[in-house]
């Protein structure tokens, strides 16, 4: 029996949405020639919940608890962009103490997000030990979140004009203790992972993106900075009080999966530097702009009137959005998270467009995996760092 020298037939494989290594409910239709990837088609929408349309039928204050369900591993950033949009639209000033508290919470959330990227990414490559280490550090961050906000996840902590509550007594000391401890942990990660020959074999030169391609595809965050583009919104378009701290933009020029790993690990160290400076310099004063309470237009209920007797639920505060439009953005762990807001002199936004970094960054995946091996798909997908909650919205 003579065998053909080359196979003419191609195999089509579904990866996900229930694949054990898949990052959320993402489905990839992969065309294979043996182990070689010929084509890859991402299928999205399994986690679509209509978040933009929900926003257009709620007041900002009613909508605030929803936004933590976009990127549920970096919830402080979704809260920040949601309150920043009406603050910029109505020119609301933030107390300095509230701005410092926001920066501390944002950078802790960035570290937590990068940690939960690192653990599963290493597990996808076959290294199980870091997966357990990162949860050890992440729990310490969640302890800090719980002490300050009352919630380990889905914090609902940011408010228009400030934050919901001041930092509790002793919280800053605990935060500084964590910073000292975590800096040693980052060194441990790098000793354990960065020079590992098996790890380098899996990531070095895999998923290359040039600087020009990164810009043309609209990539942002570590995906962009790993390709030699020094673009970080905290530097180029400062918000909150980031311009008052001394820190450096972390970037690499190689553009492969290893470079994206190095950028994220280095960013965790820079986040610690920002947190340490913020907690040492944090000023006194109010944690919210009390003038913002002017938007609470609901009248006070009188003793024994109709509302007092029959309406158990109090009306939520209203915040009227003037007839303007603007785009606001923050540097989230995965890239540029933006909101395009259009107001029309009503309580509800006329348009609330979300610019999710994961959705934009995912578009380049088919180009990266073509002509690669099947096993490289999970390496490349893991290096992109997506959360399907913000991809599908």
Swiss-Prot record:
It is found in: Plastid, Chloroplast thylakoid membrane. One of its GO terms (molecular function) is oxidoreductase activity, acting on NAD(P)H, quinone or similar compound as acceptor. Signal peptide: none annotated. One of its GO terms (cellular component) is chloroplast thylakoid membrane. InterPro entries: NADH_Q_OxRdtase_suD, NADH_UbQ_OxRdtase_49kDa_CS, NDH1_su_D/H, NiFe-Hase_large. Its EC number is 7.1.1.-. Its main location: plastid. NDH is composed of at least 16 different subunits, 5 of which are encoded in the nucleus. NCBIfam families: NuoD, PRK06075.1, PRK07415.1. Belongs to the complex I 49 kDa subunit family. This is NAD(P)H-quinone oxidoreductase subunit H, chloroplastic.
